[in-house]
Amino acid sequence: IQGLYNLALDTDDNDPVRSIYKNTFKKMYKRYKENGNDSLFYDAPLLMIVVGDMSLGGSAYVDGGLAASNMELMAYSQGLGICYNGFFVMASNVEPKIKELLGMSENEAVITSFILGYPDVKYKRTVNRNTAKFEMR
């Protein structure tokens, strides 16, 4: 996590999108240094990053999303929890240094990312729901 925070703090302020992420990262980093509060990855033991090869066409986003969805279902079936991290996706796609740190090529893009681990909270039951009514035509 230290390396990602350092990359964010080294970015150029001339780009308005980068500057938004830089300011947010500064706040996150300050909290992390002051009290160990990791508000980017929440101290999860694993960060999954789904990467797509954009030179193969626009279907990389669909394929990557479907793959992530299947990973999510498998994780839940094993008693694990996930939390998607769109902030990391956006930051990695505007900051080339993050892609470099991850060993990604120019043709690759981060499709999605999520943290994975055992949830702190377990629910014994869910909210009561009405039976779904639908008709196929």
Regions of interest found by a model, annotated:
Residues D15, N23, S92-P96, E108:
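Generic alpha-helical secondary structure signal
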Residues L46-E100:
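Small-aliphatic-rich amphipathic alpha-helix that forms the alpha element of a beta-alpha
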Residues M104-R137:
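C-terminal helix-cap and adjacent tail motif
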Residues I1-V62:
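Glycine/small-residue-rich phosphate/adenosyl-binding loop
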Residues S19, L80-V89, G117-K124:
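Low-complexity, flexible helical/coil segments
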Residues S39-Y42, L102-N107:
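Solvent-exposed alpha-helices and their adjacent loops that cap or buttress functional pockets
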Residues E34-N35, P96-K99, V121-K122:
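A short, acidic/glycine-rich surface segment
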Residues N35-G36, N93, R129-T131:
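Residue-level signal for pocket-adjacent positions within structured domains
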